[in-house]
């Protein structure tokens, strides 16, 4: 169990931090990043 705790508390690497904060190669790719607002409005208001 001690090893599990140590694994969970390991600090992030610089590359991981840059990716999360939007530095380096850019932001994380997500569905909402790829789509525009009109698509989401249609999906949530169509019913």
Curated annotation (Swiss-Prot):
GO cellular component, one term: extracellular region
Main localization category: secreted
InterPro entries, sorted: Lantibiotic_typ-A_Lactobact
Induction (free text): By trypsin.
GO molecular function: signaling receptor binding
Annotated function: Lanthionine-containing peptide antibiotic (lantibiotic) active on Gram-positive bacteria. The bactericidal activity of lantibiotics is based on depolarization of energized bacterial cytoplasmic membranes, initiated by the formation of aqueous transmembrane pores. Ruminococcin A is a broad spectrum bacteriocin exhibiting activity against a wide range of pathogenic clostridia and B.longum.
Keyword Ion transport carried by entry: no
GO biological process, any: defense response to Gram-positive bacterium
Location in or out of the cell: Secreted
Name of this chain's protein: Ruminococcin-A
Signal peptide bounds: 1-23
2,3-didehydrobutyrine: modified positions: 30, 39
Modification note: Maturation of lantibiotics involves the enzymatic conversion of Thr, and Ser into dehydrated AA and the formation of thioether bonds with cysteine. This is followed by membrane translocation and cleavage of the modified precursor.
Protein origin, superkingdom: Bacteria
Pfam families: L_biotic_typeA
KW Secreted (keyword) present: yes
Cross-link (Beta-methyllanthionine (Thr-Cys)): 30-35, 45-47
Family recorded in the similarity comment: Belongs to the type A lantibiotic family.
UniProt keywords, alphabetically: Antibiotic, Antimicrobial, Bacteriocin, Lantibiotic, Secreted, Signal, Thioether bond
Residue location of crosslink Lanthionine (Ser-Cys): 32-46
